[in-house]
Amino acid sequence: DFKRIRYPVHVILTALSMFYLGKNSFRNIALILRTVMNVLVSHTTISNWCTNFAPMFQNMALQLIPALNFNSDEWHADETVVKIQGKKYYLWLILDSETRFVLGFHLDRHRDSPQAFTILEAVKDLGSPRAIVSDRYFAYQMPVKTLHGVQHIRVESFHDDITNNLIECFNKQFKAWYKTKQGFSSFSSANNLISMFIF
């Protein structure tokens, strides 16, 4: 709720933009705000903004979903690694080929079929693609067949006509942003910050 915040909304949005679109730490953002905008705000406060406003912006993004058409040619599935308190977690993602919208994500300690089932189950009511594209990792085979009943295209980046480059490019953008964060402090914080970046 912006009403309880003592800083102007444009300052908060500027800080959020620098964090999610740039490669700035909370301390750097505080320094930039002080130098450029003459606004004194602590790095801790900026961190709290990023964590607390993530659910609000995610809800706003979710409200847009019914107006979008995800019955596209392909949905792309992939997973990438993040660290939470130094421990390895897998970020599972589904991306629509036409809108470039991330349909959903799932954060888990494991990388196996149950996690693929979880993410594909979460997005199955959003539309009906003609095919779901993934790499050749076996975990997607049964969930795609069972939950969606569409063609499953398993690709190797350099050998197939259809590639998974779309979601791999997204993962590169995510990794560039994530690298500046040096991992996440908690599972809850990771979910909030990732959802803010995605949505």
Annotate each predicted stretch with a short phrase.
Residues 1-21, 41:
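Basic, short loop/linker segments at the boundary and entry of helix-turn-helix/winged-helix-like folds
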Residues 4, 34-47:
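Short, basic interhelical loop/turn and adjoining N-cap
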Residues 5-6, 52, 105-126:
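Active-site beta-loop-alpha junctions of metal-dependent nucleic acid enzymes
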Residues 20-23, 85-109, 120, 170:
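Short conserved beta-strand segments at catalytic cores or DNA/RNA-binding microdomains
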Residues 40, 48-70:
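Short, basic alpha-helical nucleic acid-contact segments in DNA-binding proteins
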Residues 68-84, 93-95:
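Two-metal-ion RNase H-like nuclease active-site motif
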Residues 128-141:
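Acidic/histidine-rich, metal-coordinating catalytic segments
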Residues 167-199:
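Charged alpha-helix within mobile-element recombinases
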